[in-house]
Design a protein with these regions (language model features):
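Metal-cofactor-binding active-site regions of metalloenzymes
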Residues: 2-182
Length: 182
């Protein structure tokens, strides 16, 4: 065995840690929701003339996910969407997540909506799911709690962080560091 092939075998056997994911959708949605999901860091919806398929992530989805659905890599976006939309979101997760070669998922649980939680992510992927607490969600929960905001924030964060592996904030990448926090 050559050194190059030994290295290739070693790399192929490595399991990955995905350090930033959200749970998968639990219910069907339309194509716009899917394409805007490919644009997650930008909170503005895609323009009507734009497509999430025309991004590096969109190209990767068609290259790697389409074959798992029995389609050729880089298939036309419409054909990909038609095949994908014929499969439930949880079933898609059970196909795509194990194929990613990830052993541990660090899940930002701060997105609202009908989204899989930690147990569902672990079950669908065959791996382990760990919570990343989004601080903005803690702030929203503290603002809705009775009593002193700072005390509520501390208590909620303490409880949520008890089993979490980390925290995160989306403030800087959504609005920059010059935002008015008053």
């Amino acid at each position: 065995m050559t050194a190059g092939s030994a290295l290739a075998e070693h790399i192929a056997a490595l399991r990955l840690v995905d350090n930033h994911v959200h749970g998968f959708w639990l219910s069907a949605g339309d194509r716009r929701r899917f394409e805007n999901g490919l644009n997650e860091a930008n909170t503005d919806p895609l323009a009507d003339f734009d497509s999430g398929f025309d991004t590096q992530l969109g190209f990767a989805v068609r290259a790697h996910c389409a074959p798992l659905l029995g389609l050729p890599g880089h298939v036309d976006p419409q054909r990909y969407w038609e095949r994908r939309s014929g499969v439930s979101e949880p079933d898609l997760a059970r196909v795509f997540l194990p194929a990613a070669g990830v052993s541990d998922w660090l899940v930002d649980t701060g997105l609202p909506g009908d989204i899989a939680g930690l147990a569902e992510m672990a079950e669908a992927s065959g791996g382990r799911a760990h919570e990343i607490v989004r601080l903005e969600q803690v702030a929203e929960q503290a603002a809705a709690a009775p009593g002193d905001y700072a005390d509520a924030f501390r208590a909620i964060l303490h409880e949520r962080a008890r089993t979490a592996v980390g925290t995160k904030s989306v403030l800087a990448y959504r609005g920059g560091f010059d935002g008015d926090l008053s």
